[in-house]
């Protein structure tokens, strides 16, 4: 039995770790969720994700409602007030309950003397809400993105940037991948309906199912038995270009948490797959996914820039490089990305991607296929990256994804309900 813990104080502490300490929410949130009951885990997640999704609005509101920002040891109270404002603005929690629980959060973070301040700020917002929101609707922060990212999106996508921003600010749908070795997609959809859940198919990806309403994995028919995996439709699109076949030696580079590794083995169960990632901790999730789906791959920790260290001189029939990137295509899934990324990161990531591409190309057999993929929507990491690689690599040929002038296939966030994703299929010419 979990003891009664103030959820609002936990949310405030998590958000503070992200905004002030640069921690990823995916690292900060799970340990906090272990402290609360199962029924409260979803609310804690909603509060954290919601505040980070709307952070620039909440910051602006606090600047209007308070004469001075909270600093030093009182900084957590600043984020607790944000949690309160988010509940009043965006949730169905009755306002009196939202206020009471948020004010009580001050006790949990050992700032009981500030209960009156928190209560006063939130009640002041209730009184002034209509006027404040009307003013905010004209403010530059209304797009809920940092200025540097907004500028990049406007430059890269002058016609679509507003749609991208709108998609980034939505709650993401829950996509699943049906394991074709257990059931066809339509067979599994029938099982889903029997379980009282509704799903929709994707026009391009044959194994994809989108739930009408997100559900816990234990509610999904056969999840524990490996019948289905949680994976966005756009990530499933990698197989459309990789096209793995039985008997081939295939490298999945930057493989954690293993969604694409297991997809390769569902499409080509007799393929010999090596899954490599630099992050040893995240590799544990690759092992977990392989075990749940009952498939085997050779899993190694290694740096993509130095393949000789983990595969010697071996060459592969196909390589999937899901390159480290800005993750600007999955902001709706990870709203902390907006506040963790910096403008300078983009050039550094593009340099890293180029180094990995250069290093791994020598490990592709002549006639082999390399699929370069990112969950970014920035040209520096995508079309420009591949154009530069083609220009310096005489035996590389673009195939079925874009044109040499504008190489690759770019999916924008929200299109067909999928994440933002980029793919380029490269063939190594035979001499």
Curated annotation (Swiss-Prot):
Subcellular location: Cytoplasm
Keywords recorded for this protein, A-Z: Cytoplasm, Methyltransferase, RNA-binding, rRNA processing, S-adenosyl-L-methionine, Transferase
Enzyme Commission numbers on file: 2.1.1.176
Swiss-Prot/TrEMBL GO biological process terms: regulation of DNA-templated transcription; rRNA base methylation
Enzyme class: transferase
Active-site positions on this chain: 375 (nucleophile)
GO cellular component terms, semicolon-separated: cytosol
Enzymatic reactions: cytidine(967) in 16S rRNA + S-adenosyl-L-methionine = 5-methylcytidine(967) in 16S rRNA + S-adenosyl-L-homocysteine + H(+)
Pfam families assigned: Methyltr_RsmB-F (PF01189), NusB (PF01029), RsmF-B_ferredox (PF22458)
Annotated positions binding S-adenosyl-L-methionine: 254-260, 277, 303, 322
GO terms assigned for molecular function: RNA binding; rRNA (cytosine-C5-)-methyltransferase activity
UniProt main location, coarse: cytoplasm
Family according to the record: Belongs to the class I-like SAM-binding methyltransferase superfamily. RsmB/NOP family.
Function, as annotated: Specifically methylates the cytosine at position 967 (m5C967) of 16S rRNA.
Protein name: Ribosomal RNA small subunit methyltransferase B
Taxonomic source organism: Klebsiella pneumoniae subsp. pneumoniae (strain ATCC 700721 / MGH 78578)
């Amino acid at each position: 039995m979990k003891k009664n813990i103030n959820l609002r104080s936990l949310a405030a502490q998590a958000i503070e770790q992200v905004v002030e300490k640069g921690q990823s929410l995916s690292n900060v949130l799970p340990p906090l969720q272990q402290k609360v009951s199962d029924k409260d885990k979803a609310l804690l997640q909603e509060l954290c994700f919601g505040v980070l999704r709307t952070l620039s609005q909440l910051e602006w509101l606090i600047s209007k409602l308070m004469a001075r920002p909270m600093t030093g040891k009182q900084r957590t109270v600043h984020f607790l007030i944000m949690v309160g404002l988010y509940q009043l603005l965006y949730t169905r929690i009755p306002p009196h309950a939202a206020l009471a629980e948020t004010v009580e959060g001050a006790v949990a973070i050992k700032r009981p003397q500030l209960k009156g301040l928190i209560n006063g700020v939130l009640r002041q917002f209730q009184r002034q809400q209509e006027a404040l929101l009307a003013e905010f609707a004209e403010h530059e922060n209304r797009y809920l993105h940092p200025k540097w990212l907004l500028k990049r999106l406007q430059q890269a996508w002058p016609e679509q940037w507003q749609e991208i921003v709108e998609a980034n600010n939505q709650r993401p749908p829950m996509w699943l991948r049906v394991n074709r070795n257990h059931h066809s997609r339509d067979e599994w959809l029938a099982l889903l309906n029997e379980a009282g859940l509704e799903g929709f198919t994707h026009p391009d990806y044959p194994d994809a199912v989108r739930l009408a309403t997100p559900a816990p994995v234990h509610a999904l028919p056969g999840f524990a038995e490996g019948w289905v995996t949680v994976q966005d439709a756009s990530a499933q699109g990698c197989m459309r270009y990789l096209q793995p076949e039985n008997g081939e030696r295939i490298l999945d580079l930057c493989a954690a948490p293993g969604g694409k590794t297991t997809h390769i083995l569902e499409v080509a169960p007799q393929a010999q797959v090596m899954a490599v990632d630099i992050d040893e901790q995240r590799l544990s999730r690759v092992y977990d996914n392989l075990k749940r789906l009952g498939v085997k791959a050779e899993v190694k920790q290694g740096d993509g820039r130095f393949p000789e260290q983990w595969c010697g001189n071996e060459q592969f029939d196909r390589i999937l490089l899901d390159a480290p990137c800005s993750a600007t295509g999955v902001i709706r899934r990870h709203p902390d990305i907006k506040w963790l990324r910096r403008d300078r990161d983009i050039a550094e990531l593009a340099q890293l991607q180029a180094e990995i591409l250069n290093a791994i190309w020598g490990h592709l057999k002549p006639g082999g296929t390399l699929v370069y993929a990112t969950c970014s929507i920035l040209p520096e990491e995508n079309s420009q990256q591949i154009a530069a690689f083609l220009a310096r690599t005489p035996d590389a040929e673009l195939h079925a994804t874009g044109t040499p002038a504008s190489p690759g296939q770019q999916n924008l966030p929200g299109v067909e309900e999928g994440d933002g994703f980029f793919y380029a299929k490269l063939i190594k010419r035979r001499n």
